A protein has these predicted regions:
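Conserved nucleotide-sugar phosphate-binding/catalytic loop shared by glycosyltransferases and other
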Residues: 31-36, 43-62
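Internal alpha/beta domain cores that form substrate/cofactor-binding pockets in large enzymes
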Residues: 2-4, 27-28, 57-76, 81, ...
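Structural motif corresponding to alpha-helix initiation and N-cap regions
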Residues: 13, 41-44, 66-70, 116
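Surface-exposed, charge/polar-rich loops and edge strands
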Residues: 1, 162, 348-350
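A residue-level signal for conserved active-site and pocket-lining positions in enzyme catalytic cores
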Residues: 7, 29, 51, 81, ...
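N-terminal Rossmann-like dinucleotide-binding module
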Residues: 1-42
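Internal anion-binding site segments
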Residues: 195-350
Length: 350
C-alpha cells in the first residue's frame, strides 16, 4: 500500500514510525509550514524532523485544499492518506486524491472531544477514561465513521502532557489496524458516530490559564492539569505596595473542605496552624491557597522572570508579609464555564 503521511506534532510520530517500520511504501510526508518566531528561522515540527532523519520526502503546503496542492497529491497516486495532528480540515477534493481516502488518528474517544485539543479537554472535563480513535475521514470535523479505538484510565494526578505522551503510544496499534481494515476492504465494519454525544474540544488560549480562586477546587485542579504544559496556568500575587506579581503554577493538589473558607478570604493563604485545627495537612514544601470549597496546595510555582521553585520557597521570598492574597478576578473564567457546560450539553451537530 502506498501511503501519504500528514501531521505535525509529537503525537503523530510513534504511529508514523510504526507505519514506516511496517515496510509499507511512504510516498511523502506532508506537514504545515512553521511561522518564524523572534527573528529566527521557522522551527521544524517533530514530524518533519522525524521524516528527515529517515530520508523521507517532505512537502509543506500552506493550504492542503488549494487546487495546486490537490493536483500534486493526486499525482502521487497514493492508496491512502494517514492524518494525525495536521491542523487543517481536508475538503472532499483533497480526500479523493488517494484511492481509499484518508484515515485520521484522533486523541479522544469520539464522538467526545471533537476539535484541536482533545487530550486537554479530556482532563478539563474530568473524564475517567481517555483514548484514541481512528476514523475513515469525511469533510466534517472529526466526524467520520470509527474504524477502531483504544482507551485508558486517566490517573488522578495526570496532566495533559503526560496523558498525551501515553496516548501517542496507545494510538500505534489502532492506526495499523485501521490501515489493515482498508487493505482488506473491511471498512464496512466501521461504526458511524452518534453526533448526539459529540462535544467540542476547541483550541486553547493563554488567557484560559488564569486561575479564579472563587471556583471549586476540583475545577481548579482540572484546569491546572489540563493546561500543562501549554498554555499553562497562572495567577497574580497582590503585593503590599499595590503592585502584583505574575506567578505560573506548575503543580498543585486539591483538598476539598467546606470548613476552609471560614479561615480567610478566597485567594488568601491557608496557614498550617489553621489547617491542623480541622485535621488537614500537606507537605512543608508547599503552600495552600483558599478556594471556594477547600484549598489548592501549590507544590511548584514560578514567579515572573524567575526559576521554578517550591511553594514554601516562594512564600519565604514573596509571600512572607501578613495578609497577602492572590488576585480573584471579578468576571467569570470562560474556560471553567465551558468545562461546566461540557458535562451537561452535548454538541448535537457536526
Amino acid at each position: 500500500m502506498r501511503i501519504v503521511l500528514m501531521g505535525n506534532g509529537p503525537f503523530a510520530v510513534p504511529s508514523f514510525d510504526a507505519i514506516h517500520s511496517s515496510a509499507r511504501e511512504i510516498a511523502c510526508v506532508v506537514a504545515r509550514p512553521a511561522a518564524p518566531s523572534q527573528g529566527k528561522g521557522p522551527p521544524e515540527s517533530p514530524v518533519i524532523v522525524w521524516a528527515r532523519q529517515r530520508g523521507l520526502p517532505v512537502h509543506t503546503p500552506i493550504s492542503i485544499n488549494d487546487a495546486d496542492t490537490v493536483a500534486w497529491l493526486s499525482s502521487l497516486k497514493a492508496d491512502l492518506l494517514v492524518v494525525c495532528d495536521y491542523g487543517q480540515i481536508l475538503k472532499p477534493e483533497a480526500l479523493s486524491a488517494a484511492r481509499l481516502g484518508g484515515i485520521n488518528l484522533h486523541g479522544s474517544l469520539l464522538p467526545r472531544h471533537r476539535g484541536a485539543a482533545p487530550v486537554q479537554w479530556s482532563v478539563l472535563a474530568g473524564d475517567v477514561f481517555a483514548g484514541v480513535s481512528v476514523i475513515h475521514m469525511t469533510p466534517g470535523l472529526d466526524a467520520g465513521p470509527i474504524l477502531t479505538s483504544a482507551s485508558t484510565r486517566i490517573q488522578t494526578d495526570e496532566d495533559a502532557g503526560t496523558l498525551e505522551a501515553r496516548l501517542s503510544q496507545l494510538g500505534v496499534e489502532p492506526t495499523l489496524r485501521g490501515i489493515e481494515m482498508l487493505e482488506r476492504h473491511d471498512h464496512p465494519a466501521s461504526v458511524p458516530q452518534d453526533r448526539s454525544y459529540a462535544t467540542r474540544a476547541p483550541r486553547l488560549k493563554k488567557s484560559d490559564g488564569e486561575l479564579h480562586w472563587n471556583y471549586p477546587v476540583r475545577w481548579l485542579d482540572r484546569q491546572i492539569r489540563g493546561l500543562q504544559p501549554w498554555p499553562g496556568v497562572f495567577t497574580h500575587l497582590e503585593l503590599p505596595d499595590g503592585k502584583s506579581l505574575r506567578v505560573i503554577v506548575h503543580r498543585a493538589t486539591p483538598i476539598e473542605s467546606v470548613e476552609v473558607p471560614k479561615f480567610g478570604q478566597v485567594g488568601g493563604l491557608f496557614l498550617p496552624a489553621d489547617a491542623a485545627s480541622i485535621n488537614l495537612s500537606w507537605s512543608d514544601q508547599a503552600i495552600a491557597v483558599i478556594a471556594r470549597d477547600g484549598v489548592m496546595v501549590l507544590e511548584s510555582v514560578q514567579p515572573s522572570g524567575k526559576r521554578a521553585m517550591s511553594g514554601s520557597e516562594f512564600m519565604r521570598g514573596y509571600a512572607r508579609h501578613s495578609g497577602v492574597r492572590f488576585r480573584v478576578p471579578e468576571s467569570p473564567q470562560p474556560l471553567l464555564e465551558s468545562m461546566m457546560a461540557l458535562l451537561t450539553e452535548p454538541e448535537g451537530t457536526e
